[in-house]
Amino acid sequence: MAEIIQERIEDRIPELEQLERIGLFSHAEIKAIIKKASDLEYKIHRRTLLKEDFINYVQYEINLLELIQRRRARIKYSFKKDEIEYSMVHRVQGVFGRASAKWKDDVQLWLSYIVFCKKWGTKTHLSKIFSAMLAIHSNKPALWIMAAKWEMEDRLSSESARQLFLRALRFHPECPKLYQEYFRMELMHAEKLRKEKQEFEKAAMDMGDFDHPEEILKGELARIIYKNSISKIKGAEFHVSLLAIAQLFDFAKDLQKEIYDDLQALHTDDPLTWDYVARRELEIESQPGEEQPVSKQAKAVEMGRREERCCAVYEEAVKALPTEAMWKCYITFCLERFSKKTSSVPLRGQRLERTMLAFRKAHELKLLSEVQYKQWIDLLLRQDLFKEALQVAEAGTELFKDSVTMWQTKLQVLIDSKSPDVEMRFEEAFAHLKPQVCLPLWISWAEWSESAKSQEDTEAIFKKAIIAVTGASSVTLKEKYLDWAYRSGGYKKARAVFKSLQESRPFSVEFFRKMMQFEKEQEPCKMVNLREYYERALREFGTSDSDLWMDYIKEELNHPFGKPENCGQIYWRAMKMLQGQSAELFVAKHAMHQAGH
């Protein structure tokens, strides 16, 4: 092994001598490079090979290459690249080759190899790398697409890209992304041929080998892919994705029309089809051939007409397809348009009216989802229509009695409208909902009570909540209760609440840390109380939380009434209680602290 390493170091000598001779590196730097290179070579030639060693080797060489580039730029010296950089790049490729052969399954390693070759100008090597990678990772469509794009965009070889896509589709005959990218590639190829033809015609040159059939120039190959793909992959979503790609190419108008017509013919029962057809009206001028509107008012009128046409299509859609999904598309469109900024008051009014009407119609047909009831309520509240918002909230909770979100929305409307029935409605919500989902409502009730009721009433709510909410959900509630106690009654009240809850498991570390913080804000801050809180916290989390132990030690060291002599005992207790990685982490933190970091 020593002979191999020596030989590889000797292979570096010519490039290192050149680096020193042309003044890019000093003699001392060259010696440091040789020492580092020897260490790295040893690691990648020992019997037990580690991937990290190969990665470190490559990273060191890349860093060195980049440093050479920067120093070349600084002294404006660009010669001897074949003797320096090319030699280094070739060596890195060899290391990447060994690593990718050893760890074939590591996709990230292959991708790093590819990125390196692209950056350092060894693109001729890339075809072989892609072939080797795809032989192992043929089950990953994204890698086939990457290879095909490289052939098309970097090597300008549409034929090689086409062959890769065809091979990929044999492995993945029902992969939408492959068909989409293959379709895009053929359209790009046709566009490129058309531009070449135009250039030849402009120059009045003989077309020769560039004289392609008219069908190819019109995108016939893309059309064949489209037809094959829709026979394999069903659904309007895929169909629409191909149409969106085709619309990027102006020459493909006939293909766009064919795809659009097929979409309407094949997917009339899919809400996405209707949604696409309706939204398309936004792009079509109301009166083709006429001058475009110039003034803001004229533009607003034109936009109003387009939106009206969209809504007419949606109205037809919800009659033909009266489903929740179809109404969702319609309402989403209305909300999107209403959220668009406009200085036109009439246009904004039209948008609001259309949105409200769509919500009402869907509600009457019982085709509104829970989310849309919430959207409707939010919209009404933004317009200060509290009475209508409450009516909608009532209807929503009737339909979705088991939804805590719906109840919370309704209760928030009652709170915002300063209803006298808030307390009664909270009780009603708890009667309908399962206790384990009620945490958000208990918190809302307590927050409302804090601003609207007496301290006694608020505490009564917290006490009820602690009994009602059990398990992990109760942790947040206890923290909220402690916070409220400190806000409303100061430290004395918070300590009383802490004492009352200290056996009501489960807890969070934050629960104890809050109490420690409250203590630290007192004058004087009593170390005896801090010890009590740390001990209570460690009883619950001493086996896993290394930070608690470290903070306890620091407290004894830094507090005016701390006992530094206790630190040794705390350290050994921590070592006994902490388990696994937590113990290792604690030892490392303790060592850092002792070293003054």
From Swiss-Prot:
HAT repeat windows: 121-153, 156-188, 304-335, 488-520, 524-557
GO molecular function terms listed in the Swiss-Prot or TrEMBL record: snoRNA binding
Signal sequence region: none
Gene name of the encoded protein: Utp6
Keywords: Nucleus, Repeat, rRNA processing
GO cellular component terms, semicolon-separated: chromosome; nucleolus; small-subunit processome
Gene Ontology BP term (one): ribosomal small subunit biogenesis
Organism: Mus musculus (Mouse)
Family matches, as SMART domains: HAT
Quaternary structure and partners: Part of the small subunit (SSU) processome, composed of more than 70 proteins and the RNA chaperone small nucleolar RNA (snoRNA) U3.
Protein name: U3 small nucleolar RNA-associated protein 6 homolog
